[in-house]
């Protein structure tokens, strides 16, 4: 029975590793495609809209995030006996926090931008923000930078505190028990800072719903028939924000699981599972943005046609080869 569970564990880890690699590849391809399309459009038109600037920055941050995760996984699984000092751990945490921070905050700026562009309120403060949407995005990013600096400082203080506590009993290198407990504390700290963009995104989401409801109620009183352009824009923005929240919830869930069962961080199967769940957010959210953007969708269409033609050609060649083998047998 013990042998059976060992085989099952190996199969599960191999399956999750394949899923993880596939997620990494398609995530880098999707985000790289967005950067390429927007940069080509920028070279062609000599200018880039605010939405495209945010989408490009978001894609670049997620490419960095996915590449960083890939390097981290290679180091963890290829060099299991590698001795890590407290300074190395701090560098790893700072890079991880930096990648997550920009990926989440730029996505939050995108939801704020959608809200200010599409929502319709007669409130004077809202109109003030709506007319100064670029400044709102700039201030949001500036606040996020201040929070990033504070997050990194507190994380470094946390790792230094654990180092000083355990330095009396063990060497300067990190034991697996120490690393798991330190990782749990860092994740708790990270969750606290992640709550700020969550609250901001949730607020814009609820206000978008309220704006859609008031607009729909107003339209029912004056116009009979299908949706107007503003209602359609509301629905598209809501679909994008809902998809963002679902994937973001999965990301938060992966972090909470690591906090709840931090002692399992010593097991490779649990680590790979958490990474598979964690990567779903930066990978699949990029494809949702591609589907929701007309320019990206149109640019992606020729690639889909080429891929379909390649698949058809491969299937035809496979059938021809199979038929040739049957003829040779008979």
UniProtKB/Swiss-Prot annotation:
PROSITE patterns assigned to the protein according to its UniProt record, in alphabetical order: G_PROTEIN_RECEP_F1_2
Which SUPFAM superfamilies does this UniProt record tie to the protein?
A: Family A G protein-coupled receptor-like (SSF81321)
Q: Name one Pfam family in it.
A: TAS2R
Cysteine pairs forming cystine bridges in this chain are none
Task: State which ranges are Extracellular (membrane side).
Answer: 1-16, 75-95, 157-190, 261-269
Q: Which GO terms describe its molecular function?
A: bitter taste receptor activity; G protein-coupled receptor activity
Q: Which UniProt keywords apply?
A: G-protein coupled receptor, Glycoprotein, Membrane, Receptor, Sensory transduction, Taste, Transducer, Transmembrane, Transmembrane helix
What family does this chain come from, according to its entry? Belongs to the G-protein coupled receptor T2R family.
Q: What does this protein do?
A: Putative taste receptor which may play a role in the perception of bitterness.
What protein name is recorded for this chain?
Taste receptor type 2 member 117
Species of origin: Mus musculus (Mouse)
For this protein's source organism, the top of the classification is: Eukaryota, Metazoa, Chordata, Craniata, Vertebrata
Q: Which gene encodes it?
A: Tas2r117
